[in-house]
Structures are given as C-alpha cells and as structure tokens.
Amino acid sequence: YEMLRSLVGSEMCIRDSAYYAQKAGKPDIAADMCTRAEEALAGREKDEYLLLYMGLFIAYYLMTNPERGWEYAERCIDWSLRTNTLKKYRFSCDMVEALKYEMRPEVHLALPEEFPLYRADGVYSVSELGRYFYQQAEELARRYDARNGNSGYMDRLKEIMSN
C-alpha cells in the first residue's frame, strides 16, 4: 500500500497504480486511485499526449467496468493511428495486457475508418484485436531491438504475454 501511495506523484502513476492495485487484489486502493485519475483527466479528454499513459488505465477498467474501458480504448485507438512509434509500441503492449481482461468474444466499438481492422458494423472480435496489437508491438519491438542491438523491447512484450 505504501509503495502505491508513493507512486501517486504524477497522473501516470495514479493511472498505473489503479491497475497494479486491482491486479494485486487491492480493489479499495484501486478505486481510490481510479477516482484520482478521473479527476486529473477531467477537461483533458482530448489531450493525445496522454496515449502513453492510458493503456493500463484501460486495463484497469476492463477488469472493473468494461464499458468505461472501451470508451477510453476507442479514443486511444484513434490517437494511436497518428502518433510516434514509441507511443504506438507502448500502447500496443498495454492493449495486449488489457485485452486479457475482456471476457466477451466480441465488442461493439466506434473506431475510425483508418483503423486497419475497421468494420462498418462496429463489431470487433476481441481475439482479433489482441492479435492486431500484439503484431504491431512485435513489429516495433523487432525494429527497436535491431537498432539497439539487444532484446529489451521483445523481452517486455514476452513478459506481458507470460503474465
């Protein structure tokens, strides 16, 4: 609990703390962190720079309130189409993690036509979305790791898949 409280210094940490507290079986702390994060987001729902920090917040909501999680996911998926590759990688990894918590086989989403899996009927297969985000993260990880001469980005993706 104290470790989580020490992380509350920034909005990113508040959002991430909600996810980690929920995953650790601390729903009261998670709910408190979520409330704080929602307050910090008020009036800033269109700030695309937040994409880097929203993935685990989406995961928290897919664990606790899937409809709210998908509201954030719709917005962030749109942002992810026109962001830099680092934010795209991080968001894709976080969506791979988040989608583990969606138990329905299909979801109804309002996604932009530019989204590679766009469907006019708005019905998306959760497993197909998971594959899309995994493949995107994997492709970017391979490029970053080749550039860096190590396996750090793929290691992160493998860790997400193994948890």
PLM features: residue spans?
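Structural motif corresponding to the intra-repeat A-B loop/turn of tetratricopeptide repeats
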Residues: 24, 63-64
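Residue-level signature for tetratricopeptide repeat
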Residues: 19-20, 59-61
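Alpha-helical junction/boundary sensor with strong preference for TPR arrays
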Residues: 5, 34-45, 79-83, 141-148
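C-terminal non-catalytic interaction modules
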Residues: 81-163
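TPR-repeat structural position
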Residues: 27, 66-67
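Single conserved hydrophobic/aromatic residue that forms the stacking wall/gate
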Residues: 1-14
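TPR repeat positional signature
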Residues: 14, 54, 92-95
